[in-house]
Amino acid sequence: GVLILSGDHLYRMDYMDFVQSHRQRDAGISICCLPIDGSRASDFGLMKIDDTGRVISFSEKPRGADLKEMEEAEKKPYIASMGVYIFKKEILLNLLRWRFPTANDFGSEIIPAAAREINVKAYLFNDYWEDIGTIKSFFEANLALAEQPSKFSFYDASKPMYTSRRNLPPSMISGSKITDSIISHGCFLDKCRVEHSVVGIRSRIGSNVHLKDTVMLGADFYETDMERGDQLAEGKVPIGIGENTSIQNCIIDKNARIGKNVTIANAEGVQEADRASEGFHIRSGITVVLKNSVIADGLVI
């Protein structure tokens, strides 16, 4: 069989259980799925399944009347596709080469048609899973990691998560107050306040900075003290967040330079804005400071 995964999901799963289920039920295609409530139903591919677990209908991100048709019953959850599939190799090759040679998407093009003629089985996954393919979902999933108890944990010793080795030193935190937050390696925090936020590697946060409900992705490199001093002397902004700055409900991308006395709060509640020339966008009410951008001293967003 061929296992197909998506790259923008957060979950922990033993694929062997999924593979065993696929083999035991002699499925042509198996779809990993999970129950969700009606408020999120139109964001996912939804399935109808029979008593044997066979998928008898599939609709990718349905709305309106199509959404009503996909509801199992008034009090039962929707069954949503996770975008994780196993195909018998010969079935996959036949679908891609002959049936759908121009198709670009499994969920919206291949699976709905295949469900009508191939033995497609649903495999129920009952653990944590989150699609982080949008700005809003990425933001919320990151902040949820800082909550206690967290729905998803990177600290399960029996099921460790592996990432790139960076050989960074521990973070240096001086005179700061940090609550319900995650601070990565190699950071410098000086007399700041960090609430319900995630702070990425090599981040620099200056004195009297207030960070709240913010995902700061950090930096790819360090600037030396001399480089930072020269930039400040020339009126430029070093990487990190300058002193007396307040930021909330924000994603700060890598290598961003945010000056002193900046306020990022979106006080007017703008939902969507494209301000790339000024170094930021607003998506779903969340301010996104762009990678390598410069936010000048004193700017209010």
From Swiss-Prot:
<keyword id="KW-0750">Starch biosynthesis</keyword>
<dbReference type="InterPro" id="IPR011004">
    <property type="entry name" value="Trimer_LpxA-like_sf"/>
</dbReference>
<dbReference type="GO" id="GO:0005524">
    <property type="term" value="F:ATP binding"/>
</dbReference>
<dbReference type="GO" id="GO:0009507">
    <property type="term" value="C:chloroplast"/>
</dbReference>
<keyword id="KW-0808">Transferase</keyword>
<dbReference type="InterPro" id="IPR011831">
    <property type="entry name" value="ADP-Glc_PPase"/>
</dbReference>
<keyword id="KW-0934">Plastid</keyword>
<dbReference type="GO" id="GO:0019252">
    <property type="term" value="P:starch biosynthetic process"/>
</dbReference>
<comment type="function">
    <text>This protein plays a role in synthesis of starch. It catalyzes the synthesis of the activated glycosyl donor, ADP-glucose from Glc-1-P and ATP.</text>
</comment>
<dbReference type="InterPro" id="IPR005835">
    <property type="entry name" value="NTP_transferase_dom"/>
</dbReference>
<keyword id="KW-0548">Nucleotidyltransferase</keyword>
<keyword id="KW-0547">Nucleotide-binding</keyword>
<comment type="pathway">
    <text>Glycan biosynthesis; starch biosynthesis.</text>
</comment>
<dbReference type="InterPro" id="IPR029044">
    <property type="entry name" value="Nucleotide-diphossugar_trans"/>
</dbReference>
<dbReference type="GO" id="GO:0008878">
    <property type="term" value="F:glucose-1-phosphate adenylyltransferase activity"/>
</dbReference>
<dbReference type="GO" id="GO:0009501">
    <property type="term" value="C:amyloplast"/>
</dbReference>
<dbReference type="Pfam" id="PF00483">
    <property type="entry name" value="NTP_transferase"/>
</dbReference>
<dbReference type="InterPro" id="IPR005836">
    <property type="entry name" value="ADP_Glu_pyroP_CS"/>
</dbReference>
<protein>
    <recommendedName>
        <fullName>Glucose-1-phosphate adenylyltransferase large subunit</fullName>
        <ecNumber>2.7.7.27</ecNumber>
    </recommendedName>
</protein>
<keyword id="KW-0035">Amyloplast</keyword>
<keyword id="KW-0150">Chloroplast</keyword>
<keyword id="KW-0021">Allosteric enzyme</keyword>
<comment type="subunit">
    <text>Heterotetramer.</text>
</comment>
<dbReference type="Pfam" id="PF25247">
    <property type="entry name" value="LbH_GLGC"/>
</dbReference>
<keyword id="KW-0067">ATP-binding</keyword>
<dbReference type="GO" id="GO:0005978">
    <property type="term" value="P:glycogen biosynthetic process"/>
</dbReference>
<comment type="similarity">
    <text>Belongs to the bacterial/plant glucose-1-phosphate adenylyltransferase family.</text>
</comment>
